[in-house]
């Protein structure tokens, strides 16, 4: 009788400890995912703002219309930021057409363009952030931040977006799940 009672208490204590570890693991995953997201989106937004400041120097007004001058020099000034973040930086006009991009291979940004809804969110809120596929542009999840390209006269001439793959978060979460499943076994 005493053996059965000890065994029952031991089993109950083990299950409480195991449940606590799993619960703490899940809470850790939620906080880690939120931290990853906020950190990455913050860095992308900061660099998109910096790219917008740089871009403003390359825009002139001709007969009331804005034009980019020296696209190659502008793009080459964006590339160090893009490489440091492992991101794509691209400029879209207010119609959603992508005018410039740092993407290193075939550019889906120019093929699909930016959805009007995203452009409107930037114009209305001063910023746009998402973890998603940017409409049809990306095949997997990307962190994306967009900021308005506001000229010295206060006009919004376009939107600068910075996007980076969310694959690192996916791998991290997978590793955490593996660790939790090992604890469970």
Where does each model-flagged region fall?
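Amphipathic alpha-helical bundle/coiled-coil segments
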Residues: 82, 89, 143-146, 163
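Extracytoplasmic/periplasmic sensor domains and loops in membrane signaling proteins
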Residues: 76, 103-140
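A short beta-strand signature within small-molecule sensing/ligand-binding domains used
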Residues: 138-150
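Acidic surface patches and DE-rich sequence motifs
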Residues: 93, 136, 151
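Conserved small/polar residues in nucleotide/adenosyl-binding loops
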Residues: 183-185
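Juxtamembrane segments flanking the first transmembrane helix
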Residues: 2-99, 103-106
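Glycine-rich acetyl-CoA-binding "A-motif" of GNAT/NAT acetyltransferases
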Residues: 156
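Helix-start (N-cap) segments at beta->loop->alpha junctions
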Residues: 150-153, 161-180
């Amino acid at each position: 009788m005493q053996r059965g009672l000890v065994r029952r208490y031991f089993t109950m204590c083990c299950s409480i400890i195991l449940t606590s570890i799993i619960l703490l693991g899940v809470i850790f995953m939620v906080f880690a995912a939120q931290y990853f997201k906020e950190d990455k989106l913050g860095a992308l937004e900061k660099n998109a703002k910096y790219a917008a400041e740089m871009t403003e120097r390359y825009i002139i007004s001709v007969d009331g219309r804005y034009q980019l001058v020296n696209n190659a020099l502008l793009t080459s000034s964006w590339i160090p930021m893009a490489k440091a973040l492992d991101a794509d930086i691209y400029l879209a006009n207010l119609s959603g057409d992508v005018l410039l991009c740092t993407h290193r291979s075939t550019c889906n940004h120019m093929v699909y363009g930016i959805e009007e809804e995203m452009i409107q969110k930037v114009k209305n809120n001063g910023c746009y952030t998402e973890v998603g596929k940017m409409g049809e542009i990306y095949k997997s999840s990307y962190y994306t931040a967009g900021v308005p390209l506001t000229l010295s006269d206060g006009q919004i001439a376009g939107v600068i977006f910075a996007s980076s793959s969310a694959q690192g978060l996916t791998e991290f979460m997978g590793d955490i799940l593996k660790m939790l499943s090992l604890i469970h076994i």
